[in-house]
Amino acid sequence: MSTYKTCFRFEDFYDWPPDPGLYCGSISSARFSRSSSGNRMLKVVYALQGVEPAYELVADYFVLEGESLSALAVFLARRRLVELYRACRIFPKEGDAINPAGLVGARLQIRVEHEEWEGQTRLRVVSYRPLAEPSGEEIPF
């Protein structure tokens, strides 16, 4: 007979998101969907490295079309999307189709900040950077 006792642990009661900052990660999914207002958007989910499992997946939304949107909101969302593509080393040109499947698996750096939402602190994606390319030079020690 086992004497092992399943019990609650400290981390079951306290939930701290990772510090704001830059994290390496990859894109685990990207797909078109509709916002709660019916606007067409792209939802991108990033898998962050080096964070607790509860915060490993972070979603980012790009609202690209909709009657209730301001021209500025659409412009800013599209500009952020171009920044994301470039951080993934994909360089779209005017007229190219937005292809979410082409983003899946891309590795990049994701900057996150804390945001209060419905009384809880959650992560919000604020920017992206490409991963540094290996220079091919050896580091002298």
Kindly label every feature range from the protein language model.
Residues 1-141:
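Short beta-rich binding modules
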